[in-house]
């Protein structure tokens, strides 16, 4: 018979800091590999007053590549959300519902950073990805099936300090 095993997904990384998150290394929730199907990326959820990084920083929820099997697909990408300057009410709603509405959505900027050409350099140095796994092996009807890309969101609230509104 034909015996394969599915690989585990990437799991979840959640860091909530009251101050600055300094990441000069690697945070990953990458899908695993098995003898058959390859795992999807997991989830990374980082919240703090700021996020600092370096050229060596890697934040990845990528799906696992298929480089070993002729009969299985690569894992899909996971989800990454990095949140800066959110207040307690905004964080509570985001944790509970996964979105911000009403007064909690006021003065919020959400940048969609999906895909290889995303402008991540506005926010950080290094690599930020939730790409789908690459499929070097499986060809069906002349097409290679890779994992779908995941999502990357950079969510910013109002920075603390003096706010002057002139009318």
Model-identified regions with their sequence ranges:
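Enriched but not universal
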Residues: 153, 158-167
């Amino acid at each position: 018979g034909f015996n394969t095993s599915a690989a585990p997904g990437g799991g979840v990384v959640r860091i909530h800091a009251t101050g600055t998150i300094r990441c000069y290394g690697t945070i990953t929730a990458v899908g695993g590999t098995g003898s058959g199907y390859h795992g999807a990326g997991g989830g990374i959820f980082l919240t703090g007053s700021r996020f600092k990084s370096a050229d060596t920083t890697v934040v990845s929820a990528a799906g696992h590549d298929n480089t070993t099997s002729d009969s299985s697909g690569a894992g899909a990408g996971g989800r990454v959300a990095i949140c800066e300057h959110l207040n307690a009410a905004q964080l509570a709603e985001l944790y509970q519902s996964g979105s911000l509405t009403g007064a909690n959505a006021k003065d919020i900027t959400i940048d969609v950073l999906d895909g290889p050409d995303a402008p991540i350099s506005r926010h950080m140095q290094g690599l930020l990805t939730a790409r789908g796994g690459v499929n070097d092996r499986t060809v069906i009807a002349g097409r290679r099936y890779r994992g779908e890309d995941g999502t990357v969101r950079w969510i910013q609230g109002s920075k603390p300090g003096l706010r002057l509104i002139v009318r």
